[in-house]
Amino acid sequence: DRTLAICKDLGCDIIDMPINCGLTVGFQTAARYAVDHGYDYMVQFDADGQHCPEYIKVLVDRAQSDGSDIVIGSRFVSVRKDKTLRMIGSRMITGLIKILTGKRISDPTSGFRLFGRDILKKYYYDNTLNPEPESLALFLKQGYSISEVQVKMRERQGGESYLNPVRSMQYMVRVFVTLLVVQWFR
């Protein structure tokens, strides 16, 4: 993909990893960079064209207005989830997070999120955290605030999802095991 070239053309700060280390390592590296360079916020944003950059300001405005530690660009604040297999899985994660934390996140699998400085520091010092629903639940249990803003997302503009039916099931099992078992020891 042309993400690197586009970001360079736009004058963005760039961390060019020598190899693909995966989402978690990439995210942790970016969080460390953001903390080291004094950023107040960092936005997680997919490069496949689904996320509309004009909503970044909406996420920042929400964080600044209500002090949210995390703001999720949600597909489902005011729109109901489809009844696809993927959305049924998302509903199950939403329900489990609600049971475990008492708080509802309507779109816990959204990859469009803003993280405030306090959360970035958590990622800086704890390499067991990942940018996935189970970390959102952990942050809620620890008293951090998460809010959501309604956004529109486009169909994928490029690339291919790593999720196929088998990986989707593995993802769901991992999230559920982490939420139900691992987090009790944190």
Q: For each predicted feature, which ranges?
A:
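Catalytic donor-sugar/metal-binding loop of nucleotide-sugar-dependent glycosyltransferases
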Residues: 103-104, 126-127, 137-154
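Hydrophobic residues within well-ordered alpha-helices
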Residues: 7, 63, 138-141
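Acidic helix N-cap motif at the loop->helix transition within catalytic regions
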Residues: 1-10
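Conserved dinucleotide-binding and phosphotransfer motif residues
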Residues: 10, 37, 142
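Cell-envelope/extracellular polymer assembly enzymes that use nucleotide-activated donors
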Residues: 134
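Acceptor/aglycone-binding surface of glycosyltransferases and processive sugar-polymer synthases
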Residues: 13-36, 41, 53-129, 155-179, ...
